[in-house]
Amino acid sequence: MLLLKQKGKDILCNKKINIRGNHMTGGQLKLLTKMKKLITKGNKKFINRRDRDYLKELLEIGITESLAWQEILTLSSYNYVPDYKPFYLKSDSSLVFKKEINGNRVYIKLKIEEYNNKEMTVCLSFHLDYK
């Protein structure tokens, strides 16, 4: 049983509260930390996919590329969601998040890739969440 405050009253609740969000593994947390360090160093890149133009997607959300990177830097385990259909990547080295931005639920997928012998955080998806 948990003791919770609701409108100034103490109430008992037998629900479990997930304090760590959606349970990122230690390896995933390290990967997210590394991604954020690369972003702050300027080692970051958006990918245009055949089926999506990231600039149009950002415009639809109402943010710039710079603001998108700022939003990515605020991601935590609370925003993490398991990637049940990693169709684009055949590895578990990507991380997927969902976050409210400008009143919209946004789907964000990140990965670290190497470009010109330099590791970069790559944003594979940053668009409205359609699920």
Named regions from a protein language model:
Residues 8-10, 15-16, 23-91:
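Compact soluble domain cores
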Residues 105-131:
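Enriched for short, Lys/Arg-rich terminal
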Residues 87-113:
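Basic/aromatic recognition patch in beta-strand/loop cores that engages polyanionic ligands
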